């Protein structure tokens, strides 16, 4: 509903330019149209007069009065007030919210979507777990946040490419291989010959057992079969990494998370992209050698100190393949790139940005954008859950899904701002009560389905056309409050995308569900009067549609029965 108001205000500014009140070179400023905290200050407010007064040297309150007088008339606006130093407050007529409720049903699944992204390409990378063990709850939070961000960006008109970066090179992979090899040779954690820094979870024994049995792994484009040779380190490496990739993919599929691109870190070395990137940085003049190592002049690009790229032994530090990887994103045409990571990666961001800037190929500052999430604490029975027998040291995503559900796990992992620490209460997530937010929201959806089923069972035919035409019959305050809440949805979708804060969708859905439950308890719906009944069912169906659209952005289901 903000867009028509903005257009109206711009028409008023143009009228003042035309009659000489404003200089002809006065452009509409980047003004705000927002919903005040309380409706007594109006449904919407704008600071446009105060911004214009700065540009023209006018009294902002007088300019506000002049601008209001120049606004075209609108049936959607009941009255306009000037407040404080020059705020313009708009009080909307109920018909405006009735029209918006009708728009919901006309636009159906597209309600709330916009074209602000203009079909530009954005790469969203998330999860990107090392294939060294089961996905833990932190990976689950990354999956929930990243997948919701991708859905939000698509809803805002972006062409989204979902990407998973496999860190399948480095010391941790070497430790994995040595762990599986030791298990295959009959060793166990605690044995004298058990490797240092080995992984101790039961999943290592599972991999070794599968390897010794000659099992095959069905990957997307190939089948990998074990050689059963415990001395063949390369074969164990290939089998173990792909076994865990397959396990991770299984968990992500159960979590309703999919990707367009799976990118292997090892491919950067295999294809010579790491060496090629280093040579580009040398050629750009932003490196130097010292102490037998190759350094990046990262302080020239905002980092707090220069960084070693290639150590004296010839090996690369971990951020060098990260630069090569993000360079590949740029070369693949990503006008925008967003990387979702755990907050423990914070220290690497500046050096990756510095490396990309040092390439001097037109990559804009701040590309890629980063969304960092804080840790998750899992609670059961009032106590923290720290260990998983399968993983040997942490709570897995699979544990949470099996103990609660995919819907509950996704909701709880997305419900807080990414940079806030999160407590996952297993007991609460399993409750079928209004205290459980995902149950509360899904129950609102199911209630509408129940209403429609009851109407059918009672032979109370629903006429949506009549209902749309009769929304003015709903003059009570709870109906108006529900319509107002519905109308906020497109704004929330846009704001959540702009801020990269998908938890705002979850917050909004709780507020919408509360407005609906309040309306439901205060309003008999299946009344005898057909006109009134159709209007109420139309409002209920519009609520259901917005709930469905919002839950879809979260990747959470819409059960018709609870």
Curated annotation (Swiss-Prot):
Gene: argS
One Pfam family recorded for the sequence: Arg_tRNA_synt_N
Molecular-function annotations in GO: arginine-tRNA ligase activity; ATP binding
Reactions catalysed: tRNA(Arg) + L-arginine + ATP = L-arginyl-tRNA(Arg) + AMP + diphosphate
Subunit structure of this chain's protein: Monomer.
This enzyme's EC code(s): 6.1.1.19
PROSITE patterns in the record: AA_TRNA_LIGASE_I (PS00178)
Protein name according to UniProt: Arginine--tRNA ligase
Organism superkingdom: Bacteria
Protein family: Belongs to the class-I aminoacyl-tRNA synthetase family.
Motif interval(s): 'HIGH' region: 129-139
GO cellular component annotations of the record: cytoplasm
SUPFAM superfamilies according to UniProt: Anticodon-binding domain of a subclass of class I aminoacyl-tRNA synthetases, Arginyl-tRNA synthetase (ArgRS), N-terminal 'additional' domain, Nucleotidylyl transferase
GO biological process, one term: arginyl-tRNA aminoacylation
Family matches, as Gene3D superfamilies: Arginyl tRNA synthetase N-terminal domain, HUPs, Isoleucyl-tRNA Synthetase, Domain 1
Keywords attached to this entry: Aminoacyl-tRNA synthetase, ATP-binding, Cytoplasm, Ligase, Nucleotide-binding, Protein biosynthesis
Source organism (scientific name): Xylella fastidiosa (strain M12)
Compartments (UniProt record): Cytoplasm
InterPro entries the record matches: aa-tRNA-synth_I_CS, Arg-tRNA-ligase, Arg-tRNA-synth_N, Arg-tRNA-synth_N_sf, ArgRS_core, DALR_anticod-bd, Rossmann-like_a/b/a_fold, tRNAsynth_Ia_anticodon-bd
Cross-referenced CDD domains: ArgRS_core (cd00671)
């Amino acid at each position: 509903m903000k867009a028509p108001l903005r257009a109206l205000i711009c028409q008023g500014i143009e009228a003042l330019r035309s009659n000489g009140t404003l200089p002809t070179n006065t452009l509409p400023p980047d003004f705000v149209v927002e919903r005040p905290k309380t409706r007594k200050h109006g449904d919407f407010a704008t600071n446009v007069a105060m911004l214009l007064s700065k540009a023209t040297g006018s009294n902002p309150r007088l300019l506000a009065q002049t601008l209001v007088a120049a606004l075209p008339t609108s049936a959607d606006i009941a009255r306009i007030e000037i407040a404080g130093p020059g705020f313009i407050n708009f009080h909307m007529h109920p018909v405006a919210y009735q029209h918006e409720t009708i728009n919901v049903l006309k636009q159906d699944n597209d309600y709330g979507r916009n074209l602000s992204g203009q079909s530009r390409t954005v790469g969203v990378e998330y999860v990107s777990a090392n294939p060294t063990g089961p996905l833990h709850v932190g990976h689950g939070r990354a999956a929930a946040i990243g997948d919701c961000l991708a859905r939000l960006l698509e809803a805002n008109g972006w062409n989204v490419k979902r990407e998973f970066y496999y860190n399948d090179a480095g010391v941790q992979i070497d430790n994995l291989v040595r762990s599986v090899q030791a298990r295959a040779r009959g060793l166990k954690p605690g044995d004298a010959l058990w490797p240092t820094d080995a992984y101790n979870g039961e999943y290592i024994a599972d991999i070794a057992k599968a390897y010794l049995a000659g099992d095959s792994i069905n990957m997307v484009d190939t089948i990998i079969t074990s050689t059963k040779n415990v001395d063949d380190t390369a074969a164990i490496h290939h089998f173990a990494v792909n076994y865990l990739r397959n396990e991770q993919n299984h968990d992500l599929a159960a979590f309703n998370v999919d990707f367009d691109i799976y990118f292997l870190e090892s491919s950067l070395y295999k294809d010579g992209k790491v060496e090629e990137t280093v040579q580009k940085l040398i050629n750009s003049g932003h490196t130097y050698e010292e102490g037998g190592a190759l350094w990046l002049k990262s302080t020239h690009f905002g980092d707090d100190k220069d960084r070693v790229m290639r150590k004296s032994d010839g090996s690369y530090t971990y951020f060098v393949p990260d630069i090569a990887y993000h360079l590949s994103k740029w070369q693949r045409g990503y006008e925008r790139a967003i990387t979702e990571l755990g907050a423990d990666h914070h220290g690497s961001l500046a050096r990756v940005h510095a490396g990309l800037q040092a390439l001097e190929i037109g990559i804009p500052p701040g590309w890629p954008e980063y969304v960092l999430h804080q840790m998750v604490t899992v609670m059961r029975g009032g106590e923290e859950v720290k260990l998983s027998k399968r993983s040997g040291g942490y709570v897995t995503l699979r544990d949470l899904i099996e103990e609660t559900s995919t819907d509950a796990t996704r909701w709880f992992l997305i419900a807080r701002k990414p940079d806030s620490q999160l407590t996952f209460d297993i007991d609460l997530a399993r409750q079928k009560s209004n205290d459980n937010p995902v149950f509360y929201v899904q129950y609102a959806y199911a209630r509408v389905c129940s209403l429609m089923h009851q109407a059918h069972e009672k032979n109370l035919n629903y006429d949506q056309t009549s209902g749309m035409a009769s929304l003015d019959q709903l003059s009570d305050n709870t109906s108006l409050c529900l319509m107002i809440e519905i109308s906020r949805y497109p704004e929330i979708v846009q704001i959540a995308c702009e801020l990269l804060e998908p938890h705002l969708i979850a917050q909004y859905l709780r507020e919408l569900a509360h407005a609906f439950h309040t309306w439901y308890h205060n309003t008999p719906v299946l009344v005898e009067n057909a006109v009134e009944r159709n209007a109420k069912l139309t409002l209920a169906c519009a609520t259901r549609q917005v709930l469905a659209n919002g839950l879809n952005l979260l990747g959470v289901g819409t059960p018709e029965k609870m």
